[in-house]
């Protein structure tokens, strides 16, 4: 009977005493004179299964003793329940067949490796416990995001990766060109003549799908995007990467309060789904990565997210008598230490900070009646700070044009965006959730390089 380890863990009693066949990779191997133990993992489940082989009962015993860590094998044996031992069951091997050998220089040996070293062998690191857990949770969380929106009849929109938009201040962009940059065509002023390029104008990798998402919200009402975005920022921090994934919903006929309700429901839904469907992985993170992680996430699910204005947030910080490295100021952004104080000291839970100063926010955010703030919101969570950023969009054409003028946003390039206001425009709201930022929060793994399969960072594109 050809089985997976996951199938056996679901109902070991069903297969007790039966001959089974398993295929997988050796995680650990201990051999002795008359018997030996192999920890086998087949990728279907976080836990390994122990294979016991003996000289008296296992075919080609001596050959089995020479099998290396990392080798792929097929095991034929009997499943035996072992309730009195540390593992609930094991396989008594009748035969162990080598599928693919692994040399002595295999980098992933059964010992502790630094995360820095494992980034250098990113093609092999999912074979470790840590990264097996990380990337299964990544898969489960991604599915949960789609499930959340699909259950509420949101339309999934594939926004373009190649774009003529410059992101309007969202971040430095990667240019895409087919021109020979050693001899590019020039205009009279010596600037590069992009009319000779593939698209006939400058093109970039996208930093956001929001603007295109707004277009589809004006047709389908509720939409979401979930795809890769790119930032050419030369930043080597634990939270920055040049390629990452964003979830960007957009809802029509909706104001900022509707937006905050959607954010809270989505974060709780996805977190609850991960806790339910990745129990072994989450227990591993709680034990070995971030002590108290499960308690933190349980508190998130039970809490009601507080809502305060940016002005109220600054006042709380100023009255706290806490010594901050960066003094909080009205009209300015919140630093990470401010975010953590609000969530961990002031409110002991998640906090929405809304109504931000217009001068530090994007042109498309709706201007409030005070003419000083915009209908923007950030969700702050304990331990991580900002998790989500969003806003109600400016639906009034005249106000939007004035904001674009004040912020020196080229109207000509975004005339199509203005059409959304000219032809049946409505209130829309939306937000952006950096998928990797969420994974950092939910796993406790602190570096963005360790929650992306093949991280892209400055001077690093090995794979």
Swiss-Prot record:
Keyword entries, A-Z: Aminoacyl-tRNA synthetase, ATP-binding, Cytoplasm, Ligase, Nucleotide-binding, Protein biosynthesis
EC number: 6.1.1.22
Catalyzed reactions per annotation: tRNA(Asn) + L-asparagine + ATP = L-asparaginyl-tRNA(Asn) + AMP + diphosphate + H(+)
GO molecular function, one term: asparagine-tRNA ligase activity
GO cellular component terms listed in the entry, alphabetical order: cytoplasm
Gene Ontology biological process terms, A to Z: asparaginyl-tRNA aminoacylation
Keyword match Ribosomal protein: no
Compartment(s) of residence: Cytoplasm
Subunit structure: Homodimer.
Family according to the record: Belongs to the class-II aminoacyl-tRNA synthetase family.
Name of the molecule in the record: Asparagine--tRNA ligase
The encoding gene: asnS
């Amino acid at each position: 009977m050809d089985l997976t380890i996951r199938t056996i863990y679901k109902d070991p009693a069903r297969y007790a005493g039966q001959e089974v066949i398993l295929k997988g990779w050796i995680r650990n191997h201990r051999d002795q004179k008359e018997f030996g133990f192999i920890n086998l993992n087949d990728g279907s489940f976080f836990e390994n299964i122990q294979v016991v082989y003996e000289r008296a009962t296992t075919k080609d015993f001596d050959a089995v003793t020479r099998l290396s860590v990392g080798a792929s094998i097929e095991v034929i044996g009997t499943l035996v329940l072992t309730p009195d031992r540390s593992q609930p069951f094991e396989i008594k091997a009748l035969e162990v067949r080598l599928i693919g050998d692994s040399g002595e220089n295999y980098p992933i040996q059964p010992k502790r490796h630094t995360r820095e070293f494992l980034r250098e062998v990113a093609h092999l690191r999912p074979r470790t416990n840590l990264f097996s857990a990380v990337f299964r949770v990544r898969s489960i969380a991604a599915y949960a995001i789609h499930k959340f929106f699909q259950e509420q009849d949101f339309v999934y929109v594939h926004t373009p990766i190649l774009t003529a938009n410059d992101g309007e201040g969202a971040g430095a962009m990667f240019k895409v060109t087919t021109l020979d940059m050693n001899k590019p065509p020039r205009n009279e002023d010596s600037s590069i003549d992009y009319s000779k390029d593939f698209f006939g104008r400058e093109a970039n990798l996208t930093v956001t799908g929001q603007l295109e998402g707004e277009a589809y919200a004006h047709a389908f009402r509720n939409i979401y995007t979930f795809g890769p975005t790119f930032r050419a920022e030369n930043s080597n921090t634990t939270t920055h990467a040049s390629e990452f994934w964003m979830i960007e919903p957009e809802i029509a006929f909706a104001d900022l309060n509707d937006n905050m309700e959607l954010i809270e429901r989505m974060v709780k839904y996805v977190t609850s789904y991960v806790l339910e469907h990745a129990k072994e992985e989450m227990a591993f993170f709680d034990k070995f990565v971030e002590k108290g992680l499960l308690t933190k996430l349980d508190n998130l699910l039970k809490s009601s997210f507080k809502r305060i204005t940016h002005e109220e947030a600054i006042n709380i910080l100023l009255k706290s008598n806490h010594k901050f490295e960066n003094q909080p100021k009205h009209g300015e952004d919140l630093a990470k230490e401010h975010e953590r104080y609000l969530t961990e000291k002031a409110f002991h839970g998640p906090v929405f900070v809304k109504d931000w100063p217009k001068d530090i926010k994007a042109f498309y955010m709706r201007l409030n009646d005070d003419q000083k703030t915009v209908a923007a919101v950030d969700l702050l969570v304990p331990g991580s700070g900002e998790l989500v950023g969003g806003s109600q969009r400016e639906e009034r054409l005249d106000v939007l044009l004035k904001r674009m003028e004040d912020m020196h946003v080229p109207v000509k390039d975004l005339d199509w965006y203005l059409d959304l206001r000219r032809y049946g425009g409505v209130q829309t709201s939306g937000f952006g959730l950096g998928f990797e930022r969420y994974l950092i929060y939910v796993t406790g793994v602190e570096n963005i390089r360790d929650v992306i399969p093949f991280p892209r960072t400055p001077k690093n594109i090995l794979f």
